[in-house]
């Protein structure tokens, strides 16, 4: 998803 929280949870 394209959410503001998704950008912060991009720890792959």
Curated annotation (Swiss-Prot):
Similarity remark: Belongs to the universal ribosomal protein uS19 family.
Tagged with keyword Zinc: no
One GO MF term: rRNA binding
Keywords: Ribonucleoprotein, Ribosomal protein, RNA-binding, rRNA-binding
Task performed by this protein: Protein S19 forms a complex with S13 that binds strongly to the 16S ribosomal RNA.
Listed name of the protein: Small ribosomal subunit protein uS19
Keyword Oxidoreductase applies: no
GO cellular component terms given for this protein: ribonucleoprotein complex; ribosome
């Amino acid at each position: 998803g394209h959410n503001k929280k998704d950008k912060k949870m991009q720890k792959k």
